[in-house]
Amino acid sequence: KGLVSSSNESVDKPMTLITSTQRRNNPMFLDSKIHHNNLLNNILAKIEANLANADDAVMLDLDGFVSETNATNIFMVKDGVLYTPFADACLPGITRKRIMELAENVNVKCEEKRLSLFEFYNADEVFCTGTMCGLAPVSYVDGRQINPNNPQYPGNITSKLQGEYVKLTQDESYGVKIVV
């Protein structure tokens, strides 16, 4: 049985991530809120991911904390709480914002905090969000299986949020109406 993407198409497998040697730009020098600022380091990180046969690359900030992937925002679940990195060194994406709102709507506590790779390695669930992927579950980070004692993809909270996101994106009253 495939997973459901935001477009309601079947996704064959969850994402695999590696950690890039490229660091995310420091927001003091390149504002992460400007989407198309210099993304060379994100491109180099994606090349690293491709060479490692991974879907995307986790990017760390200059202090070594998880920031985002080369193309998406990242979330993790531990003990029923949803966590995502502060948006100071990453683009505060629209999908990220919607997922945080949906979490609140379905009574899932969501916190922004500085997160280490170790916390992601030991998470119960990990997923990425973006305009193109919607909400995409992650099964491996740096070759480490997420929650190896219960490798369910997507996990319960990820699945709940994914379902809510699909409902939101299929609601005709949501978004911008395009008239042709």
Model feature map: region roles:
Residues 1-180:
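Helix-start/capping segments and mature chain N-termini
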